[in-house]
Amino acid sequence: VVTSTSIGKLFLAGIIPGILIFTMFSIYSYVYSRVKNVGVLPRASWAERWQAVKDGALVLGFPLIIVGGIYAGIFSPTEAAAAAVAYALFLEGIVYRTLTWKKVINAFLDTGIITGVVFILVGAGQAFSWFISFLRLPQEIMPQIIGADPTQLKLIIIVVIAYFVACMFVDPIVAIYVLSPIFQPYVTNLGIDMVFLGTLVTLQAAIGSATPPFGCDIFTAQLIFRRPYWEVIRHTPPYILMLILATISIIAFPGTATFLPNSALIN
């Protein structure tokens, strides 16, 4: 949104890297469970599997509405989010009949609080971005960083490191609003694909947010799973390493991020 890059193309760009990351995580989890002798769950019967399919069938409507609606040109990203909320209300209120007015009001309140926090962060990020532009810091600092003869690879590495480090300490939304206006002119001048770079930036936001000591996702996981801080971060290094390897793979083979967007009929 900040750089006017197609949301639909960014979704597509993440599919192949997502499969790569999924594969690495799966292999690591399998090896870890074998080495640590974690054990396996009892094999589910075909009846249990079919029941699980029936229970989860309606929930699969969410990715169809959000991703499918955006790809098909039916919804904008904002409209897709609203349609998903309407679908959730339909499932909970009509199909499962578990929705009450108290739950609706609490959901509205929680959403309002989260949205308010996000907008405060976005507003602060935009203000800081304007301040940086006003002081002409990009024009003063960037030439010193990228040198007199910048190349695509050099700039990509600088962008990756900058977003990775920034997202270790602040919310990714703030990092994107602050850093994007600094890098965008140089990215455009060097002809770097914005969808390719957006995929890398999104990945760095995920890595930085999960990196100790101040990654936002660490504290989120701590609150959700109610585990001590040290217990949460103790298991993150292997996954961070795999995400870094995925980043290197995408940089080495840009087609992993650009093939599907370039093949799709999405503006």
Residue map of PLM features:
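Alpha-helical transmembrane segments of multi-pass membrane transport proteins
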Residues: V1-N267
